[in-house]
Design a protein with these regions (language model features):
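A short, glycine/Asx- and small/polar-enriched loop/turn
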Residues: 48-50, 153-155, 255
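Adenine nucleotide phosphate-binding catalytic loops in nucleotide-utilizing enzymes
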Residues: 56, 190, 196-207, 217-218, ...
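Short linear motifs in intrinsically disordered
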Residues: 19, 135, 142-144, 244-254
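N-terminal leader/targeting and accessory segments in enzymes
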Residues: 1-86, 90, 218, 226, ...
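Short beta-strand "acidic-cap" motif of Rossmann-like dinucleotide-binding folds
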Residues: 14-19, 129-131, 242
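Short, well-ordered turn and helix-capping elements at secondary-structure junctions
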Residues: 41, 88, 108, 135, ...
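Phosphate-binding loop of NTP-binding sites
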Residues: 7-10, 31, 45, 65-223, ...
Length: 307
């Protein structure tokens, strides 16, 4: 929600926000943008009379042991008939519409892979917009609009795509709102036991995301994940590029900090960087495969990761 507020501010809106508590680094970023933050969810905030309330999924209709609403501001919004929407819906309508969206989904590695992909596109001169669930050091902000030109071929937005539900009034996963042309399915394990009964329930949500990718789009899928194989088995209508496994379209040979990127056994590039761990090696392959879909050569992507 902090990144969304930053995007709205960059777009020229006056933005205020509230939460139970706001902490660095996001609080510092929002303060620097001139976004006023209020603690708590009191009804006195109705006096601001905004054009629109954007509701985060932390908000609910639940009540305290005393019987009082836990989120009195939300109750006042509903009683007054004030306009409201969810964060993902606002993004879809005001930021993502008409853009080539590159979405990064998965149980793990979303923030890292989204940051890598955005940086690759930046290094390639594509000036992407992005929304990341953290503050990447190489950008210094969690979100920006990027180059926006209606109908322009280079009009990209990279977004961290979460499978958690959208809002108390919209129980679909957030990522179904984003309608990506390029979607990374990084991995898939059981998570969010508060809203999902089992792994198949999450797999169904991931397949909902797959359904939104157009025929000329691309799915970048971890070939090591049986759960993602099951997701695609439910139906797939787009080009698929796999990564990770030896027989994948994109694989790696070497140590995680110094490895060759292969396509069907043929060397395409070499990545030398300070990051370690096989997980980051896989994240890099995913970002490289996604960037290729928008015309970034693998060698250029590898150079960007090294920087």
């Amino acid at each position: 929600m902090g990144g969304l507020a930053a995007l709205a501010r960059e777009a020229g809106h006056k933005v205020t926000g509230c939460d139970a508590g706001v902490y660095p680094p996001m609080s510092d970023q929002l303060k620097a943008l001139g976004i006023e933050l209020m603690e708590g969810f009191g009804v006195e905030q109705m006096q601001l009379k905004p054009d629109l309330y954007v509701i985060g999924n932390v908000v609910s209709r639940s009540r305290l042991p005393s019987g009082e609403p836990k989120f009195p501001l939300m109750e006042a919004i509903l009683e007054s008939g004030s306009p409201y929407t969810s964060g993902p819906q606002w993004l879809s309508e005001h930021v993502l519409q008409g853009r080539h969206v590159l979405a990064v989904a998965g149980t793990h590695g979303k923030t890292s892979t989204t940051s890598m992909l955005a940086w690759i596109l930046e290094a390639a001169g594509l000036e992407p917009g992005f929304l990341v669930g953290g503050v990447p050091l190489n950008f210094g902000v969690s979100a920006r609009l990027g180059k926006v030109a209606a109908g322009h071929a280079r009009n990209y937005f990279v977004i961290e795509a979460d499978e958690y539900d959208t809002a108390f009034f919209d129980k679909r996963s957030k990522f179904v709102h984003y309608r990506p042309r390029t979607a990374v399915l990084n991995n898939l394990e059981f998570d969010h036991a508060d809203i999902f009964d089992d792994l198949p329930a999450i797999e169904r949500q991931f397949h909902h995301l797959v359904r939104t990718v157009p025929g000329l789009g691309r799915l970048v899928v971890n070939g090591l994940e049986e759960s993602l194989t099951r997701v695609l088995a439910q139906g797939c209508w787009s080009e698929v590029r796999s990564f990770g496994a030896a027989v994948s379209d994109f694989s790696a040979v070497g140590e995680p900090h110094n490895f060759e990127v292969l396509r069907h056994g043929q060397k395409l590039a070499e990545v030398k960087w300070d990051l370690g761990g096989v997980h980051n090696q896989l994240n890099a392959l995913a970002a490289i495969a996604a960037a290729e879909h928008v015309g970034v050569e693998v060698s250029m992507a590898a150079q960007a990761l090294a920087s």
